């Protein structure tokens, strides 16, 4: 299914409003397995809209028009589509009844013939009721092309799409199912290089890499009629990915909204283990992140933030074990970030020292970070710390 979105309204072309409807509809179409190939904007002009429809009807089999359904003279969308299809405009009974109720409850408002235009649909259309306004939308198929008319105001468009249009589209379309794999410790360019053969031959399912702060995600997507059918394809693609060059070693979790700290929080809760933290050079960011991830779960025993050490070594081995014992936690994490004197504001050279104390002993890791701003480096230091803890749990 090739779709084209046409935004109707001179105010879009003059920059008076931003076309947020295109973003919303593109996202929803993708979820339904509908490929949006074109975004078009056209002013409130019948001739230019007719020309736009002529082009769209030849290159797309779904044309979605947004805007131009109001009561004023420049609201021409339904009238122009009717002309293009060689049909008349007719009144929809439900939309007309809603208009009657609207004016009956507002005796001070004058009802004019223009108001009634909002209750019209193209003859032969399936009406799309508007839960958030008066202008009715519609959907009609002709010559192999489905035309959909939606209102311009985003609140009305979203309500009509969700409540009136989505159930109709879901009946006839394969949906897009996605799975997100999260990786830490490997860059996007390296990941893409390792997966070059998979990326080059992809059709359905597909995969797309996205670089995040300090990590990379892979979105796996497929069109299917059910979650079970989608899982068969996504499972195979995931297996192909993780067997490449030890990529399984970098994979840590699923999910668009997941993170390293959330993964640590989940594992702490699953194992019913507590952790105490002492940090230097991160400004308490570790403790703030874990507190947020755990919410009201009792697995963060507490912690402290210490100032500059004033020594060459950044190891906080004693501090990690002391805070573990002091707060009676299962784990004691100590993180120290030492900034080298030659660093600048936008080119920070640093060493990160990680220490994790447990009842059975102490493990440590040292990491060099360079070339980042101080704010970005703090985030990376925290990510390294959470990955260190994750690999221990």
UniProtKB/Swiss-Prot annotation:
What InterPro entries does this protein's entry cite? CinA (IPR050101), CinA-like_C (IPR036653), CinA_C (IPR008136), CinA_KH (IPR041424), Competence-induced_CinA (IPR008135), MoaB/Mog-like_dom_sf (IPR036425), MoaB/Mog_dom (IPR001453)
Q: Which domain of life is it from?
A: Bacteria
Gene3D superfamilies (UniProt xref): 3.30.70.2860, CinA-like, MoaB/Mog-like domain
Mention any Pfam family matching this sequence: MoCF_biosynth
The protein's matches in SMART domains, at most eight in alphabetical order, are given as: MoCF_biosynth (SM00852)
Family per similarity comment? Belongs to the CinA family.
Q: Which HAMAP family match?
A: CinA_B
Q: What is this protein called?
A: Putative competence-damage inducible protein
Q: From which organism does this entry originate?
A: Streptococcus suis (strain 05ZYH33)
Biological classification of the source: Bacteria, Bacillati, Bacillota, Bacilli, Lactobacillales
Coding gene?
Answer: cinA
């Amino acid at each position: 299914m090739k779709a084209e979105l046409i935004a109707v309204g001179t105010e879009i072309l003059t920059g008076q409003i931003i076309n947020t409807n295109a973003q919303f509809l593109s996202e929803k179409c993708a979820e339904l397995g509908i490929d949006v190939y074109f975004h078009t904007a056209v002013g409130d002009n019948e001739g230019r809209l007719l020309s736009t429809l002529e082009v769209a009807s030849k290159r797309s089999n779904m044309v979605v028009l947004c805007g131009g359904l109001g009561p004023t003279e420049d609201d021409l969308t339904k009238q122009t589509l009717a002309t293009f299809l060689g049909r008349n405009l007719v009144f929809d009974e439900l939309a007309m009844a809603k208009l009657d109720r609207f004016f009956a409850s507002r005796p001070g408002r004058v009802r004019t013939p223009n108001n009634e235009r909002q209750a019209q649909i193209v003859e032969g259309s399936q009406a799309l009721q508007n839960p958030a306004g008066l202008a009715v939308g519609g959907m009609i198929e002709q010559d192999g092309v489905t035309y959909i008319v939606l209102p311009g105001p985003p609140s009305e468009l979203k309500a009509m799409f969700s409540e009136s249009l989505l159930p109709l589209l879901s009946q006839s379309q394969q949906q897009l199912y996605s799975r997100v794999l999260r990786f830490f410790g490997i860059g996007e360019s390296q990941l893409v290089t390792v997966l070059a053969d998979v990326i080059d031959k992809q059709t359905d399912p597909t995969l797309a890499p996205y670089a995040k702060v300090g990590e990379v995600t892979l979105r796996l997507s497929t069109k299917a009629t059910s979650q079970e059918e989608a899982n068969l394809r996504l499972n195979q693609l995931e297996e192909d990915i993780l067997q490449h060059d030890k990529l399984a070693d970098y994979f840590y979790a699923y999910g668009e909204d997941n993170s390293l700290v959330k993964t640590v929080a989940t594992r702490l809760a699953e194992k019913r283990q507590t952790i105490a933290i002492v940090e230097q050079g991160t400004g308490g960011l570790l403790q703030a992140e874990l507190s947020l991830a755990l919410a009201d779960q009792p697995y963060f025993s507490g912690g402290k933030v210490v100032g500059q050490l004033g020594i060459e070594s950044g190891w906080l081995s004693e501090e990690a074990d002391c805070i573990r014992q002091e707060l009676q936690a299962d784990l004691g994490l100590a993180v120290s970030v030492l900034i080298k004197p030659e660093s600048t504001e936008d080119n920070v050279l640093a060493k990160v020292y990680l220490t994790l104390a447990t009842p059975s002993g102490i493990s440590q890791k040292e990491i060099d970070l360079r070339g980042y701003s101080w704010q970005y480096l703090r985030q990376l230091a925290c990510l390294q710390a959470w990955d260190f803890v994750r690999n221990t749990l």
